[in-house]
Amino acid sequence: MFDSLEVIKENSHEDASLRLQELIGKFIQDDEKFSLGLSGGSTPRFFYQNFANTYQENSDISLWTIDDRHVPINDEISNQRMINEIFSKTKMKILELQFNENPNMSADEYSKLVLSNIQNFNCAILGVGDDGHIASLFPNTTAMNNKSIGFVANEVNILSKWRITSTFELLSNIENVYLLVTGENKSDILKEIGKDNELPVNQLIKHRKKTVLETDQKI
């Protein structure tokens, strides 16, 4: 296992989520700008709801979307839709990933929006897919080789043909990255995390000085 990977095990998904909020909360200071990258899926929802309740009055927090399926925001599989539903009633600034018919244009526009609003990428929460993908950086897809810091369109043909995703370089340059991987259904991929192989999650861990894995499973 990489020395740069710190593993924190809790007894349940809820405990792991609360511990994650405690860790991230240490970086949030009064009257200081703070940015948090958000992933989609059901795993982080409990964390998001608690985070929204705790920091609902904090207008210094900017939220950006790590990746999304290339679908309209009102689509039920849109990550941005879930983020908006949870955080829209808070004072936090949501940097919304807008849908454009051309996925490359969507990625370019979101790169400009995020990079013009965020000077320091403080924290981000990532899930890990059963195939080891992070964000929408799937194994053997072209986006894995993009060297820019920003967002790109990635053709994956999973649920939707295209995804808009943070680049590997952007994820590598975030100050604090947390992998939230919980549930018995993640036991197989958890056995692979931290190995020296070509899985996107392990490539990211290998290239970062530190990555934290929060889980409720044995590893």
Q: For the regions a protein language model found, what residue spans apply to each?
A:
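Short, conserved loop/helix-junction motifs that constitute active-site signature segments
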Residues: 54-62, 143, 169-175, 204-208
